[in-house]
C-alpha cells in the first residue's frame, strides 16, 4: 500500500486530488504539519528533492519524490481510479489535461481577483467567462448520457475535473450562470457528496451570489505578500533631518530575451497619457522632484510654493478609510508601496508624500498629493482605480494656511495625525 508525506498548504484544491484519490485507494498520506508555504518550499532541503519548489509535493515512505498534483494523484490512486483498459486510461488523461488547459487558466483569471490575489482586468475576465462557458458546455454535452466522465465508475478524471471546478462553483458560478449546465451540475453535486470527497473538502456550499473584485482586499493581500520582500531604505523619525540622497538615473539594464507574454505586451499599442489632454501650465514637476531630492526641505518647500501653478495643478489630502484594520506598521508601508506600484504611469505628472503614523496595531495612513489638473486624477484611467477607493480624498485650497502647514508636515515627515499619533515612516511618490 502506498504511504508517504504530502507537502501542501491548507485548502489547496490541487492537493485535494491526491487526498481524495487516497480516500478511495486506502493510501496512507500524512500531511506535513510543519510545512510553511513560502519558507519550507524555499529551503535547501526541500529544493534538493523538489527543485521547482512547487506544492503539492509528495515523498513516499521509501524515499521517492513526486511533484505535480496530477502525477501525485495518479500514484496514490488504485487501478479502478486509473482506468480498467488502455482506452479508459487515455480518456482519463484526456480529461485531466482538459481540466488543466481548458478550465484552470480561465478559472484563475476569473476567481483570483475575487479572492483578492490578482489584479482585476475587465477584458481578461470577460474572456475567461467565455472560456468557462465553453468548457462547461463541453462537459454538459458529454454528460448528457453519462453518469461519470469515463466508464461507469468514478475515476481520476472525475476527481481532477471536480477539484479544478471547486473555486468556480464556490465563488462565481451563481445560480443564474450555472442553470444552463444541468448535466454538469448534476454530476458535480454527485461528486462533492461522495463520502470520500466530503472527507477531504467537507460540506460544500454552491455560490449564491457571484463574488466581485474588492480593491481593499487586493491591496491588503499585496501588503501581506510584500512583507516578505527585502525592505527598501526608508527615512526614519529624527530630530535633525538628513539630506536625502540624490536620486540617480539607473543605467539601462542588460536586455534579456522576451518571453511570449512580454512580446505580446510589446506588440500592444502605446497607451496615451490621460494628462496630455490638460494644459501643461508653468509648474515643472520633474524640476521640483529633482530639487526636492537634492535639497533640504527648508529650501525645497519654499521652492515648491514659488513654482506651484494653482490654475493647472491641485493639491489633495488622502486618508486610508480602514485604519482600524491596520496591524503591523510594515504592512501599512507595504500598502503604500503596492499602491505606488500600481499607479506607476501617474508618476510623471504626480508627486506624493504618504506617511504612517503610530505604532503596530494603532496606526493610520495619510498623505499629500500633487498632480496636474483640478479633479481626482485616478478617474482618468481604469488602471489607476485599484486602490484609490480605499482612501478618503479632500481637495485642498493652495492659498489656505492650513494647506501650507500640511504640505510642510508631510514633505518633512514630522508631526502627528489627527489622533495625535506620531510620525513613524513615510514614502515618496516621485
UniProtKB/Swiss-Prot annotation:
Keywords: Elongation factor, Protein biosynthesis
Domain (GST N-terminal): residue spans on this chain: 2-84
InterPro entries documented for this protein: EF-GSTs, EF1B_G_C, EF1B_G_C_sf, Glutathione-S-Trfase_C-like, Glutathione-S-Trfase_C_sf, Glutathione_S-Trfase, Glutathione_S-Trfase_N, GST_C
GO cellular component term, pick one: nucleus
Keyword Protein biosynthesis on entry: yes
Biased composition (Basic and acidic residues): 232-255, 269-278
Region (Disordered) residue spans: 232-278
Gene3D superfamilies (alphabetical): 1.20.1050.10, Glutaredoxin (3.40.30.10), Translation elongation factor EF1B, gamma chain, conserved domain (3.30.70.1010)
The UniProt record lists the keyword Protein biosynthesis: yes
Ranges of residues in domain GST C-terminal: 85-213
Residue ranges of domain EF-1-gamma C-terminal in the record: 271-430
Any one GO molecular-function label of the UniProt entry: translation elongation factor activity
Subunit structure, interactors included: EF-1 is composed of four subunits: alpha, beta, delta, and gamma.
Role played: Probably plays a role in anchoring the complex to other cellular components.
Protein's recorded name: Elongation factor 1-gamma
Source organism per UniProt: Artemia salina (Brine shrimp)
Amino acid at each position: 500500500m502506498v504511504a508517504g508525506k504530502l507537502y501542501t498548504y491548507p485548502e489547496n484544491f490541487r492537493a485535494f486530488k491526491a487526498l481524495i484519490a487516497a480516500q478511495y485507494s486506502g493510501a496512507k498520506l500524512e500531511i506535513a504539519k510543519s510545512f510553511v508555504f513560502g519558507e519550507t518550499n524555499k529551503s535547501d532541503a526541500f529544493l534538493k528533492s523538489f527543485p521547482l519548489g512547487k506544492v503539492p509535493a509528495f515523498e513516499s515512505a521509501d524515499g521517492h519524490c513526486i511533484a505535480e498534483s496530477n502525477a501525485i494523484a495518479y500514484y496514490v490512486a488504485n487501478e479502478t481510479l486509473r482506468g480498467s483498459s488502455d482506452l479508459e486510461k487515455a480518456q482519463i488523461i484526456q480529461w485531466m489535461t482538459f481540466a488543466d488547459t481548458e478550465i484552470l487558466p480561465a478559472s484563475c483569471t476569473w476567481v483570483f481577483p475575487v479572492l483578492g490575489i490578482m489584479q482585476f482586468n475587465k477584458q481578461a475576465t470577460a474572456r475567461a467567462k467565455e472560456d468557462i462557458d465553453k468548457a462547461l458546455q463541453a462537459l454538459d454535452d458529454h454528460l448528457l448520457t453519462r453518469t461519470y466522465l469515463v466508464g461507469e465508475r468514478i475515476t481520476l478524471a472525475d476527481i481532477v475535473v471536480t477539484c479544478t471546478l471547486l473555486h468556480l462553483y464556490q465563488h462565481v458560478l451563481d445560480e443564474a450562470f450555472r442553470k444552463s449546465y444541468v448535466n454538469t451540475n448534476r454530476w458535480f453535486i454527485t461528486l462533492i457528496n461522495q463520502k470520500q470527497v466530503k472527507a477531504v473538502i467537507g460540506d460544500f456550499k454552491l455560490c449564491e451570489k457571484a463574488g466581485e473584485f474588492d480593491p481593499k482586499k487586493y491591496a491588503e493581500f499585496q501588503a501581506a505578500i510584500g512583507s516578505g520582500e527585502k525592505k527598501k531604505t526608508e527615512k526614519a523619525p529624527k530630530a535633525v533631518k538628513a539630506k536625502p540622497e540624490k536620486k540617480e538615473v539607473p543605467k539601462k539594464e542588460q536586455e534579456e530575451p522576451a518571453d511570449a507574454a512580454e512580446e505580446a505586451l510589446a506588440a500592444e499599442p502605446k497607451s496615451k497619457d490621460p494628462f496630455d489632454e490638460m494644459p501643461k501650465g508653468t509648474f515643472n514637476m520633474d524640476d521640483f522632484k529633482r530639487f526636492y531630492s537634492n535639497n533640504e526641505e527648508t529650501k525645497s518647500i519654499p521652492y515648491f510654493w514659488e513654482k506651484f501653478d494653482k490654475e493647472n495643478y491641485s493639491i489633495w489630502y488622502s486618508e486610508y478609510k480602514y485604519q482600524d484594520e491596520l496591524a503591523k506598521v510594515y504592512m501599512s508601508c507595504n500598502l503604500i508601496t503596492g499602491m505606488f506600484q500600481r499607479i506607476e504611469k501617474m508618476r510623471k505628472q504626480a508627486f506624493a508624500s504618504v506617511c504612517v503614523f503610530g505604532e503596530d496595531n494603532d496606526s493610520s495612513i495619510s498623505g499629500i498629493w500633487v498632480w496636474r489638473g483640478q479633479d481626482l486624477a485616478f478617474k482618468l484611467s481604469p488602471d489607476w482605480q485599484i486602490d484609490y477607493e480605499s482612501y478618503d480624498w479632500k481637495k485642498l485650497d493652495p492659498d489656505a494656511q492650513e494647506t501650507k502647514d500640511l504640505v510642510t508636515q508631510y514633505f518633512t515627515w514630522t508631526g502627528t495625525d489627527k489622533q495625535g499619533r506620531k510620525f513613524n515612516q513615510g514614502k515618496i511618490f516621485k
